[in-house]
């Protein structure tokens, strides 16, 4: 049996359409809200069809020296063109891109996870500096 952590795939988001791209300032001010943007398919668009799509993105923050991460957001994408008339008939599609805000007083690591219904779990991370 594989450990759950081994199910996550990683790759440079500039070359892989499944890897979540995380955009944050290099440094943020202690205790002030800042923006985090996570996109799947930023450089290479990911298909968004009934048959092949991104189902969700989760974002976590692990403060430096912390033992456990904090979940700071979970976002589900539920419109992939399906309707009562069949697959890819509704013309309604959600884009796997989210923007959220949070604040911290400690530097740490932001983690983003995404799930493709065909290619499984994907992960990325970025360091966050605090001044």
Residues covered by each model-derived region:
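Aromatic sugar-binding surface patches on proteins
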Residues: 88-99
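Short amphipathic, basic-aromatic surface patches that mediate peripheral association
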Residues: 39-50
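Short acidic/polar inter-strand loop motif in beta-rich domains
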Residues: 115-125
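Short coil-to-beta strand junction motifs in C2/discoidin
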Residues: 49-57
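Short, compositionally biased P/S/T/A/G/V-rich stretches that sit at domain boundaries
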Residues: 1-29
């Amino acid at each position: 049996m594989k450990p759950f952590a081994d199910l996550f795939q990683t790759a440079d988001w500039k070359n892989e359409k499944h890897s979540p791209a995380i955009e944050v300032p290099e440094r943020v001010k202690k205790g002030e809200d800042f923006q985090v943007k996570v996109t799947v398919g930023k450089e290479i668009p990911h298909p968004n069809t009934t048959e092949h799509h991104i189902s969700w993105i989760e974002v976590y923050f692990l403060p430096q020296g912390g033992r456990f991460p904090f979940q700071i957001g979970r976002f589900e994408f539920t419109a992939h063109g399906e309707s009562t008339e069949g697959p890819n008939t509704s013309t309604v599609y959600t884009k796997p891109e989210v923007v959220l805000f949070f604040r911290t007083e400690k530097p740490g690591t932001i983690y983003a996870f995404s799930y493709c219904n065909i290619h499984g779990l994907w992960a990325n991370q970025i360091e966050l500096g605090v001044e």
